Amino acid sequence: MEEKTLKISKIKDGTVIDHIPSGKALRVLSILGIRDDVDYTVSVGMHVPSSKMEYKDVIKIENRSLDKNELDMISLTAPNATISIIKNYEISEKFKVELPPKLIGIIKCKNQNCITNTREPVKPEFEIVSRHPLVLRCVYCQRTMNERDVFE
Amino acid sequence: MLKNKSVVSIDDVQNDDLFEIFDLSESMLKTIESKGNAPLLTNKIMATLFYEPSTRTRLSFESAMHRLGGSVITVSDTKTSSAAKGETLADTVRMASSYSDIIVIRHPLEGAARLASRFTSKPIINAGDGSGQHPTQTILDLFTIKKELGSIDGKVITMVGDLRYGRTIHSLIIALSRFDVKVNLVSPEILRLPEYVYSMLPDRNYVKEYNDLEEVIGETDVLYVTRIQKERFSDQNEYQSVIGSYSINSETVEKMKKKSVIMHPLPRVDEISPDVDNMPQAAYFRQAYYGVPVRMALIYKILGD
C-alpha cells in the first residue's frame, strides 16, 4: 500500500534501500560511490511521507547488489534502513541493515596519531559505544568518533 | 589474574590484582631495603622497546627486572635499530618476543601497545603510548596515595596541568572511578580532559572542572601536577600560550592541608618550584622511588609462579 504513495517507479532487478532517515539519502549515495558517471538507473526519493518515520528517504538502484561493507556503512548512518532485493519486479529478499558489534577495516581512525594510520599490518577496528547517537571507539587508540567524524 | 597477561590499559588490571600488587609492592620495598634483591625470576628475560625518550620508566623497569634476578635486553636507541630501516612495530615485536619472556614498550603513537599485544603471545606491558595510557604509572600513583595517606577512598584528588595530552592523567582518572573519591580537574581551556576519556568513565559525578587552582587547593588531599608537554603540541603557538599556566610554589603549599601530598609523574620543567622540594607535602621523589618495587610486583604477578 505504501508503495502507491511513492513517486518513484518500481524497478525490475536491483536493490531498494528504504527507511533512510530523511536527508541522509545523499550520504548513502556517497557510501555507494554513486556519482554522475553511473551506467545504471538510480531513483532517489527524499523527504517522502512515511507511516513509520513521518518522513524518510528511499533509494532504488537498478541492476546492482550491495556487499557487506556497503551494508555496514549504511547501518552507520541509517540504522533502521531496510534492504529489498528485487528480481523481476518482485521482492526476493528483504532484511534490515544491522550494525555489527565491531567494524573492521571499513573506516579509518580520525586520530592522526593512531598506530592504525601507519604502515602496520592491521586493519582499523572499532567497537560500538552507542547506536543512537552513533559513537564508535577505536580498539587501538581508544578515541571516539561520531557520525560526522565517520563521514567527513 | 595477571599470569601471562598483557597490561595495555589500566582496565587490564582488576581491583583484586591491584590490591595484591599493593601488598606485594610493600614486600618488595622491604626486600630492596633489607637485602637489595629478590631473585624470583632468575630464568626470565625482559625486552624493553622504547621508541620515545624515557628516564624513570625505563630505568625502573630495568632495575625491577634486575632486582628480580632476571635479565634485560634492550634497543638502546631506536634510531639505530631496524625501526630506522622501516621495520614495522609488528615485525619488531614478533622478533623481540622470540628472544624474551615479556616485552615493555613505549611508543609515540596511541594504540602501539595494543597492536604489539596482537603480534605475540608473550605479555606486553604498556610503558606509555603517545597521549593514550600509562597503566604502570597509574598503579604506582595509586600505591603512592595509599602509602602516603593510608587509603585512596575518601580523598580529594586535584589534577593540574596538561589534562589533554597527559597519559598518566588519563589512566589515573579511569582507575580512580573505582574508588570513592572526588576529582578536581584544573587546566587551561585548551588542555581540558578530552571527551573520549570522559566517555570511558562509568559516571562523571566524581569529576569537576575548574580554571583556578585557588578554588580547590584548600580541600585537596592529593595535588597531582603534570608537565605541559611541548612534544605533544602540533601547534607551537598553542604551546606558548599555555606554558607556565600553573606553577606550584611554597605559597601554594601553605594553603594545602598539613596531611596532603603533591605528586608528579616527572620530569618536571617549571610547574613545581624547587622551594617545594623539602616541604613535607612533596611526595614526587618518593613516588619515583616506589617505581621499582611496584614494577617488581607487577612483573612478578605476570611472570612468577
From Swiss-Prot, chain A:
<comment type="subunit">
    <text>Contains catalytic and regulatory chains.</text>
</comment>
<comment type="similarity">
    <text>Belongs to the PyrI family.</text>
</comment>
<dbReference type="GO" id="GO:0046872">
    <property type="term" value="F:metal ion binding"/>
</dbReference>
<keyword id="KW-0479">Metal-binding</keyword>
<comment type="function">
    <text>Involved in allosteric regulation of aspartate carbamoyltransferase.</text>
</comment>
<feature type="binding site">
    <location>
        <position position="114"/>
    </location>
    <ligand>
        <name>Zn(2+)</name>
    </ligand>
</feature>
<dbReference type="InterPro" id="IPR036793">
    <property type="entry name" value="Asp_carbatrfase_reg_N_sf"/>
</dbReference>
<dbReference type="GO" id="GO:0006221">
    <property type="term" value="P:pyrimidine nucleotide biosynthetic process"/>
</dbReference>
<dbReference type="GO" id="GO:0006207">
    <property type="term" value="P:'de novo' pyrimidine nucleobase biosynthetic process"/>
</dbReference>
<protein>
    <recommendedName>
        <fullName>Aspartate carbamoyltransferase regulatory chain</fullName>
    </recommendedName>
</protein>
<feature type="binding site">
    <location>
        <position position="138"/>
    </location>
    <ligand>
        <name>Zn(2+)</name>
    </ligand>
</feature>
<feature type="binding site">
    <location>
        <position position="109"/>
    </location>
    <ligand>
        <name>Zn(2+)</name>
    </ligand>
</feature>
<dbReference type="InterPro" id="IPR020542">
    <property type="entry name" value="Asp_carbamoyltrfase_reg_C"/>
</dbReference>
<keyword id="KW-0665">Pyrimidine biosynthesis</keyword>
<dbReference type="InterPro" id="IPR002801">
    <property type="entry name" value="Asp_carbamoylTrfase_reg"/>
</dbReference>
<feature type="binding site">
    <location>
        <position position="141"/>
    </location>
    <ligand>
        <name>Zn(2+)</name>
    </ligand>
</feature>
<dbReference type="Pfam" id="PF02748">
    <property type="entry name" value="PyrI_C"/>
</dbReference>
<dbReference type="Pfam" id="PF01948">
    <property type="entry name" value="PyrI"/>
</dbReference>
<dbReference type="InterPro" id="IPR036792">
    <property type="entry name" value="Asp_carbatrfase_reg_C_sf"/>
</dbReference>
<dbReference type="GO" id="GO:0009347">
    <property type="term" value="C:aspartate carbamoyltransferase complex"/>
</dbReference>
<keyword id="KW-0862">Zinc</keyword>
<dbReference type="InterPro" id="IPR020545">
    <property type="entry name" value="Asp_carbamoyltransf_reg_N"/>
</dbReference>
UniProtKB/Swiss-Prot annotation, chain B:
<comment type="subunit">
    <text>Heterooligomer of catalytic and regulatory chains.</text>
</comment>
<dbReference type="GO" id="GO:0004070">
    <property type="term" value="F:aspartate carbamoyltransferase activity"/>
</dbReference>
<dbReference type="Pfam" id="PF02729">
    <property type="entry name" value="OTCace_N"/>
</dbReference>
<feature type="binding site">
    <location>
        <position position="137"/>
    </location>
    <ligand>
        <name>carbamoyl phosphate</name>
    </ligand>
</feature>
<keyword id="KW-0665">Pyrimidine biosynthesis</keyword>
<dbReference type="Pfam" id="PF00185">
    <property type="entry name" value="OTCace"/>
</dbReference>
<feature type="binding site">
    <location>
        <position position="106"/>
    </location>
    <ligand>
        <name>carbamoyl phosphate</name>
    </ligand>
</feature>
<dbReference type="InterPro" id="IPR006130">
    <property type="entry name" value="Asp/Orn_carbamoylTrfase"/>
</dbReference>
<dbReference type="GO" id="GO:0016597">
    <property type="term" value="F:amino acid binding"/>
</dbReference>
<feature type="binding site">
    <location>
        <position position="134"/>
    </location>
    <ligand>
        <name>carbamoyl phosphate</name>
    </ligand>
</feature>
<dbReference type="InterPro" id="IPR036901">
    <property type="entry name" value="Asp/Orn_carbamoylTrfase_sf"/>
</dbReference>
<comment type="function">
    <text>Catalyzes the condensation of carbamoyl phosphate and aspartate to form carbamoyl aspartate and inorganic phosphate, the committed step in the de novo pyrimidine nucleotide biosynthesis pathway.</text>
</comment>
<protein>
    <recommendedName>
        <fullName>Aspartate carbamoyltransferase catalytic subunit</fullName>
        <ecNumber>2.1.3.2</ecNumber>
    </recommendedName>
</protein>
<keyword id="KW-0808">Transferase</keyword>
<feature type="binding site">
    <location>
        <position position="167"/>
    </location>
    <ligand>
        <name>L-aspartate</name>
    </ligand>
</feature>
<dbReference type="GO" id="GO:0044205">
    <property type="term" value="P:'de novo' UMP biosynthetic process"/>
</dbReference>
<dbReference type="GO" id="GO:0006520">
    <property type="term" value="P:amino acid metabolic process"/>
</dbReference>
<dbReference type="InterPro" id="IPR006131">
    <property type="entry name" value="Asp_carbamoyltransf_Asp/Orn-bd"/>
</dbReference>
<feature type="binding site">
    <location>
        <position position="266"/>
    </location>
    <ligand>
        <name>carbamoyl phosphate</name>
    </ligand>
</feature>
<comment type="pathway">
    <text>Pyrimidine metabolism; UMP biosynthesis via de novo pathway; (S)-dihydroorotate from bicarbonate: step 2/3.</text>
</comment>
<dbReference type="GO" id="GO:0006207">
    <property type="term" value="P:'de novo' pyrimidine nucleobase biosynthetic process"/>
</dbReference>
<feature type="binding site">
    <location>
        <position position="267"/>
    </location>
    <ligand>
        <name>carbamoyl phosphate</name>
    </ligand>
</feature>
